[in-house]
Amino acid sequence: MSPEALQELIFTIANNLVSEGKAGTLTAEELPDSAKFAVMRPKDRAHGDWASNAAMQLAKKAGMKPRDLAQLFADALNGTDGIAAVEVAGPGFINITLDSASAAAVVDQVLDEGNRFGKNNHLSGKTLNLEFVSANPTGPIHIGGTRWAAVGDSMARILQANGATVVREYYFNDHGEQINRFAKSLVAAAHDEPTPVDGYKGAYIDEIARRVIVEANAEGIDILNLPRVDGGTDEKGEPLGEGDSEQREEFRKRAVPMMFDEIRQSMKEFRVHFDVWFHENSLYEDGEVEKAIADLRNAGDIYEKDGATWFESTEHGDDKDRVIIKSDGTYAYFAADIAYYRNKRHRKTDPADVAIYMLGADHHGYIGRMMAMCAAFGDKPGENMQILIGQMVNVMKDGKPVRMSKRAGNIVTIDDLIDAIGVDASRYSLARTDYNSPVDIDLNLLASHSNDNPVYYVQYAHARSCNVDRNAEAAQINAADADLSLLDTEADGEVIAALAQWPALLTLAGDLRAPHRIAHYLEDLAAAYHKWYNVERVVPMPLTEAEERADEQTRERTRIAKNPEPARAAARLKLNDAVQTVIAEGLDLLGVTAPDKM
């Protein structure tokens, strides 16, 4: 019997108590849905397999003492098939002990459903646009963006496992001053000149500059001798703006796509998939910025002041109004944000019911204006727009911070991390900590094959379970018709209970946008499995020389422990395979492989 089945049973009993007039002043309308009745695993096994606080939840509305109401629940639960014992404890907890067959039923459920176990339609009917990473195309993905890649892709997988339609989106900031600074840096590097004060530096700038020169020369363009003074036209024949030059424009139009390609390749190597690669520049080229401003103007949220155009965001909860067109006629950065949100909500293909933005800690000040813009379009902040803020990543090696990249100068990049510890360890370590908290990445630990390394610990549980399968096959153990009621030891119960908690945990991780909960669950399941593996045998094992020399009573006890009867071995093999299934599913949600050997 699963925790979800117990929730439904408790809900049914609550309804029956109300209809029979036994629940005091409680009415049917005041009952929460079944999912609101918490069923928890007690920390002390003496308190049963599962505990519920339903009586304490309802006692006030019922006008009853919690323990008295809890006793009514206990009386109704006693005698239910699959329940061995029920008792009331403490202020009104209902402690439930299952019989071994009922508890172990989840094992067959896992094996029947395979990697569908725990997946649900909780979020079906909703399209969630999940935008993450979205680093400027002016350099390699840095460690902060790498965290968002791991967290964002894992979150997308978890939301899909809960039935949502998820659009993974990357927003290329390819319009604005940062692109001009990138181009200026390339020109300076190409001429072996100092990096501009506001420019980008690092070996990658030299690499890109060389690639641009080679590409241009192959097309018969002597790019280094193009005019470097202001003036001229871009590739579309439009006049170049102030501070631009033909040479800088040639570097820009060639280098930005190169960075796009490099970013795409990095994401592919990191096992991160995007459905949409959206270019900021398209918002201007397609007139969407003007349309968005027009919509806000029609709604009365735009005014003119000091020669600039302002969004009256204070009317929607922001701390101050925001300029969207500067007095010189150029657009403020926020203008594109407005148009982009409007595009997400109203595009023809997969318009977003919920637009989720994953932003770095340096964007915390953007929340107010973004939510105000959402409200100005008639949407609900927090519902149609959700903003997640991630914290810093500190990379450590030999107990000291790693701050330098061979290629990118003063930042650590996604490629640096992959080279140091691989994709699996990188993704897992970045996803296992709540993105609201800073995270330390210990390169020494994550490269080690030890139980202190969390990704190794979980992957080793999967590999170990696969080895059990191989040994069981060699020993001709057949689990097809296993009697799961034989899974009656304390170690069996801990593993079974961990498996039973997976569906609720997966739902919670989706609701809370919390991939780290998946990682923590996997570590708990792996811990229960490793402990079980060390005390419960599946495949018969010969006694060691030391065990053979023990006294007769000890020797016989060890022989029995290491040579289970066939029926019990078959039941344990099923439990082993159920653990293997759930660990593989959980690792896949985090974008991490589940090896069969280590």
Curated annotation (Swiss-Prot):
SUPFAM superfamilies to which the protein is assigned, alphabetical: Anticodon-binding domain of a subclass of class I aminoacyl-tRNA synthetases, Arginyl-tRNA synthetase (ArgRS), N-terminal 'additional' domain, Nucleotidylyl transferase
Subcellular location field: Cytoplasm
PROSITE patterns named in the record: AA_TRNA_LIGASE_I
Enzyme Commission code: 6.1.1.19
One BP annotation, GO: arginyl-tRNA aminoacylation
Keyword Protein biosynthesis in record: yes
Quaternary data: Monomer.
Protein name in UniProt: Arginine--tRNA ligase
